[in-house]
Amino acid sequence: GYPVIVKASAGGGGKGMRVVASSDDLVRALNLARSEADAAFGNSEVYIEKFVERPRHVEIQILADQHGNILHLGERECSLQRRQQKVLEEAPSVAITPKMRETMGRMAVAGARVVDYVNAGTIEFLVDGQGNFYFMEMNTRIQVEHPVTEMVTGIDLVKEQVRIAAGESLRYEQDEITLRGHAIECRINAENPEEGFLPSPGVVTAYHAPGGMGIRIDSALYGGCEVSPLSSAKQVLDCQFTEFSDSVFHSGRFKVNCKRIDLTNFGKAEFKESCSGSLGP
């Protein structure tokens, strides 16, 4: 029954998606989604699935080698989004219980095994308010938000991906995968918030990244580099951090469960540029 959501089959990122509340809106939504999907991906194919009200976006990271070994490395939550595109990602999710983590991880591994998957990858789920979860899609690649998983597991996912491609076996057993601490990633986008968050290309004339214990920056930015109009505006800079205070960080194990987060560390980033950056709305 309704509501349902129409989605492009050839891509994501919020493109080619339309929520349909009733049968009266279905034809128009299909036409709009197809048109947008064709423009974005060169493929107008769409599909329809259940629309989950106010869901959490939770994804399970996996590694699968050529010898039939598959591991999951816990979850990332990517629920804070704008225009169906991720803004903040964290690991682990405060909404996922150990039992849910085990069940979702086991299902992710089973799904990868059914299709003989080999590589690093991510199984994405939607989680409703009752703790039910629904398969959404699989990303057959390393994702932008992979560093938060690296921060809490201590495992270099890109290195493992290269080892898998070289035909080597995974070096870990499932019971060796543990989550320590809490990591949050924030994307700084090349968008202009004063112009409806339109892409804002230009030259970065000066750039100074934040640093310190628990801070990691993944970026190609440098003073003098150009953010091209052809670049993805949402992939300019990623900043991950694993502490909210020295005492919390040094304790080694903690959980974040709050409505407000102090983003002081992000205030240390300095930009002098002809293009604008934003953390979201």
Where are the model-predicted features located?
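Acidic/histidine-enriched active-site and ligand-binding environments that engage anionic O-linkages
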Residues: 1-5
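ATP-dependent carboxylate activation and anion-phosphoryl transfer catalytic cores
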Residues: 8, 13, 20-240, 253, ...
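Short linear motifs in low-complexity or flexible loops
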Residues: 242-254, 264, 269, 274-278
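Low-complexity, glycine/proline/serine-enriched flexible coil segments
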Residues: 257-261
